[in-house]
């Protein structure tokens, strides 16, 4: 689980091999209908609103049309403690962009 203080944008990177990967964050499903081979990865960036497949050679391809369309794949992660759920059959990295209007207090 993760704890977030304000609604936050994210970057989700899912590593192949995997077919139709889904990660649930706070009960919300982030799903892309795609097949990734070993060495490829999928990158969802909620801030830029992009969904890209990155090949072994680093070439990027937009796969925006492969996203699940019933729910927005760019929905920000809500504040609070959020459980992360996935089938455990693939690896992923989740980067949360916590933004503040004031700097953190330094003591």
Describe the function of each predicted region.
Residues 1-107:
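Intrinsically disordered, low-complexity segments enriched in serine, threonine, and glycine
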